[in-house]
Amino acid sequence: MNLSELSPKDGAKKRRRRVGRGIAAGQGASCGFGMRGQKSRSGTGTKAGFEGGQMPLYRRLPKLKHFPLYNPKHFTVVNVGKLAGLAPNTVVTLESLMEAGIVTSNDGPLKVLGNGELAVALTVHAPCSKAAQAKIEAAGGSVVAQG
């Protein structure tokens, strides 16, 4: 057996429909297009969404804006109040927060937000909001913003 000798099984391929070759051929006369009308004429017919002259649905509905991002960037978010339980002079990174049990899953880069109170001096190695940075520096800590 060679590749050149291969052929499909009997009945695996349907015969092409030959229209307009006489009534006895089965698809003569109107060739399966019915009697009259736009869809029986030659040419491409109607465009997608055409409703016979009626205002189509896609034009009746309002235009919607502000679709959500298809591939948004996710962050692991921690508020300043959660960092209050850490020991003084701790270096705060995503890895150290996972070891301490404050963060349970890595959803992306760490971002510190300003909700809550902080009285412990910490060194934060992550991007912070302005409110979070003010609270960390007011407690005697420092922020090394990355990214």
UniProtKB/Swiss-Prot annotation:
A biological process from GO: translation
PROSITE patterns, A to Z: RIBOSOMAL_L15
UniProt keyword Protein biosynthesis, yes or no: no
GO cellular component annotations of the record: cytosolic large ribosomal subunit
GO molecular function: rRNA binding; structural constituent of ribosome
Record SUPFAM superfamilies: Ribosomal proteins L15p and L18e (SSF52080)
Bias type Gly residues, positions: 23-35
Keyword field: Ribonucleoprotein, Ribosomal protein, RNA-binding, rRNA-binding
Family according to the record: Belongs to the universal ribosomal protein uL15 family.
Subunit note: Part of the 50S ribosomal subunit.
Alphabetized NCBIfam families for the sequence: rplO_bact (TIGR01071)
Protein's name in the database: Large ribosomal subunit protein uL15
Annotated organism of origin: Synechocystis sp. (strain ATCC 27184 / PCC 6803 / Kazusa)
Chain's gene name: rplO
